[in-house]
Each structure stands twice: as structure tokens, then as C-alpha cells.
Amino acid sequence: MTLYTAKDISKNYQSGDEILPVLKGINLSIEHSTMTAIVGASGSGKTTLLQILGTLTKPSSGKLYFKECAVDEKNERELAAFRNASLGFIFQFHHLLPEFTTLENVMMPALIGGKNNAESRANAEDLLRRVELHHRLEHKVTNLSGGEQQRTALARALIMNPAILLADEPTGNLDSRSGEIVFDLLKNLGQERQLATIMVTHNNELAARMDRCVTLLDGSLQEE
């Protein structure tokens, strides 16, 4: 069974009297335990597509299916629960909460999802060990380096053991060494957890190391 399917996804924006089509009839199927790169020029709609796949933005038309169940039939409360339980997100800018520690940031989705404090803490500590930040548990995230912040964001994205990880330029704001560390962690942890990873990237070398690469060009998706 295909894990996630986008069928005939289109997205238009209104600019005065003009309608601007950004995505045109996108079809994309995502299988279990695969890494898919989405590449394309700046402004081609890559982030818009990722936001639609993450149910953060609604398409103008088209359908999303998760394990053959229509995602668009869910109400806002059900969508929020779906995102927290089944989708993990990591962005170019980590979006960590600066007033909280590394450990607290990673625990947050689990607590919101109804996990108790002890279970949330144990899972967060385990993930932070996996991303080699066990020595930074009680540090405020503002005291971490850029690479450490992004590794914290990765641990947070995995805390609910999602089926799909959506990554928007996760290495784009890092130096080459830190970016390589984050990518290797994404790949290795994804394989271990049998995640499907969908990554928007401008880095063609990273895209070539994934199972699949698709290109957004003039609003349409092309397989490479």
C-alpha cells in the first residue's frame, strides 16, 4: 500500500484581478521507507507543495491520501491530531522555542499529544543521545550552535515516531560539515525508523543521494 498520495494538486494565488497558478495538477506517490528530494528554482513552489503535503496549507484543488484515507475530509481538530501523530517537520530555520531547554523542546510534541511526562522525557533523552546532544539536555537552545539547534529540531520531529518526515531545506542554513552531519542523521534515523522522508533542497549533491528526485518546473512535477 502506498503511504502518501497527492492527486491532481493545484494551488493558485490571487494578485489583484489576476490568478497566479503556482502548482498545476501535481501527482506524487510516496512509499514507506524512502527518501524523496524535491528540487527546483527559487519561487517554483517547492515550499508550497511541502506545506500542502504537511496539511499546513490547503490546495486550490486536488486530494491527499494517507494510507488510502482522504486527508482533506478531516476537520481542523482531526488535521492537527494527524499532523502531530503522523507527520514530522524540520525547517531551514529550526523554529525552536528559545525560552525552553533542549530537552523541553524535544518533549513538547509528545506532551501535546497526550504522552505522560516520564515517557516523553525518556523518549526525548533517547533521541537526543542519538543525535549526540545528551550533554546539552538542560541548556537553553539559544546557547546551542546552529548545527546543534538543527539536530535538536530533528529529534523533536521524530519524538512522535511519525510515518513521514517533511524537511524544508534542513541543511540550507548550515556550514558544509554541520549540513553533512544533519543529513546523515536524517538518512540513518529515517532508515532505522522506516520513515518516508520528503526533502526540499537546493543541494544537488544531497538530492542525488536520495532514493528519488523530482523537479518542480513551471508548476509541474518532473521525475528525474
Swiss-Prot record:
ATP binds at residues 40-47. Its main location: membrane. Keywords: ATP-binding, Cell inner membrane, Cell membrane, Membrane, Nucleotide-binding, Translocase, Transport. GO terms for molecular function: ATP binding; ATP hydrolysis activity. CDD domains: ABC_MJ0796_LolCDE_FtsE. Its EC number is 7.6.2.-. It is a peripheral membrane protein. Pfam families: ABC_tran (PF00005). It comes from the Bacteria. Residues 4-224 form the ABC transporter domain. InterPro entries: AAA+_ATPase, ABC_transporter-like_ATP-bd, MacB-like_ATP-bd, P-loop_NTPase. It is found in: Cell inner membrane. It is an enzyme of class 7 (translocase). One of its GO terms (cellular component) is plasma membrane. Belongs to the ABC transporter superfamily. Lipoprotein translocase (TC 3.A.1.125) family. The complex is composed of two ATP-binding proteins (LolD) and two transmembrane proteins (LolC and LolE). PANTHER family: ABC TRANSPORTER ATP-BINDING PROTEIN MG467-RELATED, LIPOPROTEIN-RELEASING SYSTEM ATP-BINDING PROTEIN LOLD. Part of the ABC transporter complex LolCDE involved in the translocation of mature outer membrane-directed lipoproteins, from the inner membrane to the periplasmic chaperone, LolA. Responsible for the formation of the LolA-lipoprotein complex in an ATP-dependent manner. This is Lipoprotein-releasing system ATP-binding protein LolD. It comes from Desulfotalea psychrophila (strain LSv54 / DSM 12343).
